[in-house]
Amino acid sequence: MGGTLAWTLLLPLLLRESDSLEPSCTVSSADVDWNAEFSATCLNFSGLSLSLPHNQSLRASNVILLDLSGNGLRELPVTFFAHLQKLEVLNVLRNPLSRVDGALAARCDLDLQADCNCALESWHDIRRDNCSGQKPLLCWDTTSSQHNLSAFLEVSCAPGLASATIGAVVVSGCLLLGLAIAGPVLAWRLWRCRVARSRELNKPWAAQDGPKPGLGLQPRYGSRSAPKPQVAVPSCPSTPDYENMFVGQPAAEHQWDEQGAHPSEDNDFYINYKDIDLASQPVYCNLQSLGQAPMDEEEYVIPGH
């Protein structure tokens, strides 16, 4: 009974003493003044969406544990940690880091707690080359499980092609694809032209001047007579194009005499004329015979020329 009572009295003292071994973390507000000086040994800036300054160092010379988790940081500027000589634990979990400065990795006494990320490859290489007798480096996955950093990098971050090489491969693939598409099209068009040309050459053509079948063309015939000297034509008295014109049936013969010379039967023309009332009326007239122009040339033209 006395032993139980003694343990009951000593347990709170032991717990209080064990808690004093861990540094008490000071939780900062969202509005952090980087010009202020922090005297605490543990600073908690977790989840404040902070942006670390690149041109000045954190004024916390006594800090041992610095928690920067959950701030969306993509890099850790080496200037920010320049005066943190006592820093032993740096927590940058839940930050999408893309680069870790080599000078920070060269601090062999610094324990980095970070997500498993290929950006830690430089940290791993510098530690391996400069820090001997170190424990295996660890990283954390999304379920907060620990993994060996070397094993993670070997499996998930195998050396790949350089950006220029990848670009060249992509361009070459596009060119090959274009040639693969254009090649058959050009070959098909050349084949069609060759077949059409061979068909034209195999057709039996007639004589050079003869008509070519299928084209609907006719040969050109022409004959031109030598220019004839102009012969003076005796002038004849001008006569009207008509002498008599009547509407309806012609009257008696004496009516022709009253108008002038008797009409010649060879020069008579008969025209049916319809008046406004659409009644047919015969029209008689006498026209002087017109001479035909001499046919100086005969020419037969091929259609299309």
From Swiss-Prot:
Induction: Down-regulated in CD40-activated monocyte-derived dendritic cells. It comes from Homo sapiens (Human). The modification Phosphotyrosine is found at residue 284. Residues 204-229 are annotated as: Disordered. Residues 21-165 are extracellular. It is a single-pass type I membrane protein. This is Leucine-rich repeat-containing protein 25. The gene is LRRC25. Residues 1-20 form the signal peptide. Interacts with RIGI. Interacts with SQSTM1. Interacts with p65/RELA; this interaction promotes the degradation of RELA through autophagy. Its main location: membrane. The lineage of its organism: Eukaryota, Metazoa, Chordata, Craniata, Vertebrata. Keywords: Cytoplasm, Glycoprotein, Leucine-rich repeat, Membrane, Phosphoprotein, Repeat, Signal, Transmembrane, Transmembrane helix. The chain crosses the membrane at residues 166-186. It comes from the Eukaryota. It is found in: Membrane; Cytoplasm.
